[in-house]
Swiss-Prot record:
It comes from Shewanella baltica (strain OS155 / ATCC BAA-1091). Hydrolyzes diadenosine 5',5'''-P1,P4-tetraphosphate to yield ADP. Belongs to the Ap4A hydrolase family. Keywords: Hydrolase. InterPro entries: Ap4A_hydrolase (IPR050126), ApaH (IPR004617), Calcineurin-like_PHP_ApaH (IPR004843), Metallo-depent_PP-like (IPR029052). This is Bis(5'-nucleosyl)-tetraphosphatase, symmetrical.
Length: 274
């Protein structure tokens, strides 16, 4: 059995299929883990989501910011932009089933036998594994309530929850977890989240900012962290304990698959439109 981890697909279904063919992926034998953002921007979000749903227990994904955005669009809480490229999936006959499936997906997953953790954007450096589990579970619980649209999705868009406060309660606590696990790139030196800079570290001109993974973290002492979200990194983080898998396929670059057991990355260039 092989574990394959794939970066942000964002509707690049043809490239995903090319990658899986390269490694002879077999869902009866292997597992496909995705760092989130299955949908948006790319041409085939509907096919991507249907494919992951069809894999059953052979597919393991976490929620990314675009997956949560799809929930907001379906719930009529946001208006879709042309760049979202989600009209087909929103008008599909199985959209409700797709949303229900997404609601069952967590913000983090573990592979304990390999001491591995996966989330979309990373993990706040001040969090222990126990805190990560607890905070992600609170969001999952809220997503599985009947009133999830009103109680969570309608209120999750806020930059106010920018700093971890263990005494926070209610929506502010949930907001920080969603912000950190699906939107994080840079932190200020005091630990606050920055929501503006998307440049790679070598191009960041604000001396107050550091990439989240450059802060000391208790988790990375014994765990590998797999994440996506930050395409500008192009997989370059300079730490063997970090696997950055978003390599900008929807922006014209390539899709990356990481074979855990071989510690090998396989890539597929963005296909040209026929």
């Amino acid at each position: 059995m092989a574990h394959y981890f794939v970066g942000d697909i964002q509707g690049c279904f043809a490239e995903l299929q090319k990658l899986l063919a390269k490694v002879d992926f077999n869902p009866s034998r292997d597992e496909l883990w995705a760092v989130g953002d299955l949908v948006a921007r790319g041409p085939d979000s509907l096919a991507t989501l249907r494919f992951f749903r069809s894999l059953g227990d052979s597919a393991k994904t976490v929620l990314g910011n675009h997956d949560l955005h799809l929930m907001a669009l379906h719930g009529k809480l946001k208006r879709a932009k042309p760049s979202d490229n989600l009209t087909e999936i929103l008008e599909s006959p199985d959209i409700s089933a797709s949303i229900d499936w997404l609601r069952q997906q967590p913000l983090m997953r573990e592979l304990p036998e390999h001491q591995l953790i996966m989330s979309h954007a990373g993990v706040p450096p001040q969090w222990s594994l126990e805190v990560l589990r607890e905070e992600a579970a609170l969001v999952s619980c809220a997503l599985n309530q009947d009133d999830y649209l009103e109680a969570l999705i309608s209120q999750m868009y806020s930059d106010s929850a920018e700093k971890w406060d263990p005494s926070a309660i209610g929506i502010e606590r949930l907001r920080y977890c969603i912000n950190a696990l699906t939107r994080m790139r840079y932190l200020y030196v005091d630990g606050r989240l920055d929501f503006d800079c998307k440049q790679p570290p070598e191009n960041c001109t604000n001396p107050q900012l550091k990439p989240w993974f450059e802060f000391a973290s208790p988790l990375r002492q014994c765990h590998t962290l797999v994440f996506g979200h930050w395409a500008a990194l192009m997989g370059n983080v300079g730490d063997t304990k970090l696997k950055a898998l978003d390599t900008g396929c929807c922006w014209g670059e390539h899709l990356t698959l990481w074979h855990l057991e071989k510690d090998q990355k396989i890539t597929q260039k963005k296909l040209k439109k026929s």
